[in-house]
Amino acid sequence: MREGKRGPPCILSFRGTLERVEAQWELEAQGPGQCPAPLGDPASTTDGAQEARVPLDGAFWIPRPPAGSPKGCFACVSKPPALQAPAAPAPEPSASPPMAPTLFPMESKSSKTDSVRAAGAPPACKHLAEKKTMTNPTTVIEVYPDTTEVNDYYLWSIFNFVYLNFCCLGFIALAYSLKVRDKKLLNDLNGAVEDAKTARLFNITSSALAASCIILVFIFLRYPLTDY
């Protein structure tokens, strides 16, 4: 038999317009100088049977969005397709042999259902996640300082007003003591402290001046002016 010479391999490439498909395959001619007919023309039948076509090598396809109503909030659905997040590709089936069963420690039912739900559920909308993470409005309780420690000098003011009311200083001290009580009821700690200091000052002044007058009176009574 005469063996024919094998010519150079012919490369047939095409570019599809649907879904931006780009593919290229190689076909080897059966006889010398023969190439397969272009796409759409009938192939030559005089050269014998041709080899089977090699499947597309290097072709890639853009997955179409799944049919059905889109899931998510209105803000996510209303976005144009270009701005929406691409769907995660489905995992390819692996041809590896089945693995031996592995034993794991027992888990609670709630944690198991949560892990299965997190692994199999599609990614939730970020707007829904933000709504779920929003906390309820908290009630603010104002804690006022303890005003019972503020001394109003009320008894001291009454004593000075009744017995040692020198130049009405005891009356003024009593008025400030009453103001301290009112501000303690209103939870005004700063005002109560200031009025308490003022009442104390007037009580000290009234007591000192009244005591000085009493001492002078006793001195003049013990040593009258006629002795000098």
From Swiss-Prot:
Residues spanning the membrane: 155-175, 201-221
Residue span of region Disordered: 29-49
Keywords: Cell membrane, Lipoprotein, Membrane, Palmitate, Transmembrane, Transmembrane helix
Principal location class: membrane
Protein topology in the membrane: Multi-pass membrane protein
Keyword Cell membrane tagged: yes
UniProt cross-references to InterPro entries, sorted A to Z: CD225/Dispanin_fam, IFITM_antiviral_protein
Cellular localization per UniProt: Cell membrane
Membrane topology (Extracellular): 1-154, 222-228
Side of membrane Cytoplasmic, spans: 176-200
A Pfam family matched in the record: CD225
Lipidation (S-palmitoyl cysteine): 167-168
Any one GO cellular component localisation term in the record: plasma membrane
UniProt keyword Transmembrane, yes or no: yes
Lineage top rank: taxon: Eukaryota
Family: Belongs to the CD225/Dispanin family.
Name recorded for this polypeptide: Interferon-induced transmembrane protein 10
Gene: IFITM10
